[in-house]
Amino acid sequence: MTREEALLWLDQHIGISRETVEKLDAFVACLHAEMAHQNLIARSTVDDLWGRHIIDSAQLLPLARKEAAFNKKASPKSWLDLGSGAGFPGIIIAILSEMAVTLVESRRKRVEFLEKAAEAAGTPVTILGQRLENIEPQAFDIITARAFAPLDKLWRLAFPFSHNESLWLLPKGQNARTELEETRKLWQGDTRIEGSVTDPQSAIIVATHIHPKKQKTGKKT
């Protein structure tokens, strides 16, 4: 997908201003410059950066808006992105929306890049340079994680950062359905799988009301 094709998709599905385009361009320039120092994304995806990474991230925003409208909820205000790495989807969401976005990334060099990228794009974000389990929990309206951890581990670590109405938007590969099924013994909630607009073999797990199942205990005799 070219830059022009990506911008057309963004305008049709989200609505973007000239200022937003400038912020995206600044972020892309920063990422390209940093690639000389660290591998932020796979080299094989650099030529399709706008489709493989930017639109792949941006597609989560219409899903969030659709979910809020369908359930007649107030617009979400806080977004937690786990393992933000190169800024996908966290910084892209921050550029495209007015939500308060918090990025969690434990790797020092990635944290330094996220700080530079957010400054270059003129986009305010909160960056927590720690492991998730070492962060004081607070509840967020939306939680995302792109290649962060297997689903069961992800829910176990991130559950303290959710409330009952939190929306989970979790990009996964072709094994999304299998991964979801494997969690049903320990977790419950409302879940569905949405197709990815950028890769027919990928999917997005959409979930709400996630909480651990009460484990049955054996009866005393």
Swiss-Prot record:
Catalytic activity: guanosine(527) in 16S rRNA + S-adenosyl-L-methionine = N(7)-methylguanosine(527) in 16S rRNA + S-adenosyl-L-homocysteine
Enzyme class label: transferase
Cellular compartments annotated: Cytoplasm
Molecular function GO labels: rRNA (guanine-N7-)-methyltransferase activity
UniProt-annotated binding residues for S-adenosyl-L-methionine: 83, 88, 132-133, 146
Domain of life: Bacteria
Pfam family, one: GidB
Name recorded for this polypeptide: Ribosomal RNA small subunit methyltransferase G
